[in-house]
Swiss-Prot record:
This is Interleukin-12 subunit alpha. Belongs to the IL-6 superfamily. Heterodimer with IL12B; disulfide-linked. This heterodimer is known as interleukin IL-12. Heterodimer with EBI3/IL27B; not disulfide-linked. This heterodimer is known as interleukin IL-35. Interacts with NBR1; this interaction promotes IL-12 secretion. GO terms for molecular function: cytokine activity; growth factor activity; interleukin-12 receptor binding. Disulfide bonds join C39-C112, C66-C198, C87-C125. Its main location: secreted. One of its GO terms (biological process) is positive regulation of type II interferon production. It comes from Bos taurus (Bovine).
Length: 221
């Protein structure tokens, strides 16, 4: 029989992957920083930061159709990463009958796992999360550069969110092997940029929830 925790995790990941209309909900409790912060700490910090940024955008851009019901949902990681599939619990990813299978250990440079050793599937999961973060970080930085040129100076990206992305990427500590990403925004249209900001923030919050769930699962394994 499949472990209940694994089944709950995969159900959550699939739900987040297919249901983009998630509400912001209540703010998460503040995580106390410590010298040896784990990736779970960083993922919780990221989720708080993107939730706060999205909430601010919805308030500031209330006339830009910035709610989850109004936007056209888009996933910039589609066909580029496979985080939901890569982050399946090992017993579900490698054996349909959910029987325990042998794990091959790999040494990782990051400090997401205390031992420094992790299975091949977990390494794939963490690398996919890293690539997701990298893509969103590049996109948000390019978008913020354009927003800074807006004469109205209506909204800018919260530097706390950009810092939270960078911190988790640094904690994961993977060398990216993907082709350098080019931001999708090409024209200097501030209205379209703000609409795109809403779309990306909604998508990124969903991904941040998925990442936080996965880090929670790994930290308790």
């Amino acid at each position: 029989m499949c472990p209940l925790r694994s089944l709950l995790l995969i159900s959550t990941l699939v739900l987040l992957h297919h249901l983009p209309h998630l509400s912001l909900g209540r703010s998460l409790p503040t995580t106390t920083a410590s010298p040896g912060r784990s990736c779970l700490d960083y993922s919780q910090n990221l989720l708080r930061a993107v939730s706060n940024t999205l909430q601010k955008a919805r308030q500031t851009l209330e006339f830009y159709s910035c709610t989850s019901e109004e936007i056209d949902h888009e996933d910039i990681t589609k066909d580029k990463t496979s985080t939901v599939e890569a982050c399946l619990p090992l017993e579900l990813a490698t054996n349909e009958s959910c029987l325990a299978s042998r794990e091959t250990s790999f040494i990782t440079n990051g400090h997401c796992l205390a031992s420094g050793k992790t299975s091949f599937m977990t390494t794939l999961c963490l690398r996919s999360i890293y690539e997701d973060l990298k893509m969103y970080h590049v996109e948000f930085q390019a978008m913020n550069a354009k927003l800074l040129m807006d004469p109205k100076r209506q909204i800018f990206l919260d530097q706390n969110m950009l810092a939270a992305i960078a911190e988790l990427m640094q904690a994961l500590n993977f060398d990216s092997e993907t082709v350098p990403q080019k931001p999708s925004l090409k024209e200097l249209d501030f209205y379209k940029t703000k609409v795109k900001l809403c779309i990306l923030l909604h998508a990124f919050r969903i991904r941040a929830v998925t990442i936080d769930r996965m880090m929670s699962y790994l930290s308790s394994s």
